Curated annotation (Swiss-Prot):
Keywords: Disulfide bond, Hemostasis impairing toxin, Platelet aggregation inhibiting toxin, Secreted, Signal, Toxin. Contains 3 disulfide bonds. This is Ixodegrin-like peptide. Residues 1-19 form the signal peptide. Belongs to the ixodegrin family. Tick salivary platelet aggregation inhibitor that plays an important part in the anti-hemostatic strategy of ticks. Inhibits platelet aggregation induced by ADP, thrombin and thromboxane A2 (TXA2). Blocks platelet adhesion to soluble collagen (most probably through the binding to alpha-2/beta-1 integrin (ITGA2/ITGB1)) and binds to purified glycoprotein IIb/IIIa (ITGA2B/ITGB3) in a dose-dependent manner. In vivo, reduces thrombus weight effectively in a rat arteriovenous shunt model and inhibits thrombosis in a carrageenan-induced mouse tail thrombosis model. A motif (Cell attachment site) lies at residues 49-51. GO terms for molecular function: toxin activity. Expressed in salivary glands.
Amino acid sequence: MNAVFIAALLILGTSTFDAMRLWNYCTHILCTNDSDCGQSDSCRCRPPRGDDYRYHCSRY
């Protein structure tokens, strides 16, 4: 039973770490088109908002 519990924690930790890596990669990147934001479909190049004149990658 301990081995199953440890395996479950490792799987959960790995999936959480992977999601965090994708989130950090997608934010705060300047871009000109969607291909600059990487291969993820959820990470897109967004137009500027407010006082910022630059395009940036974000997940929405």
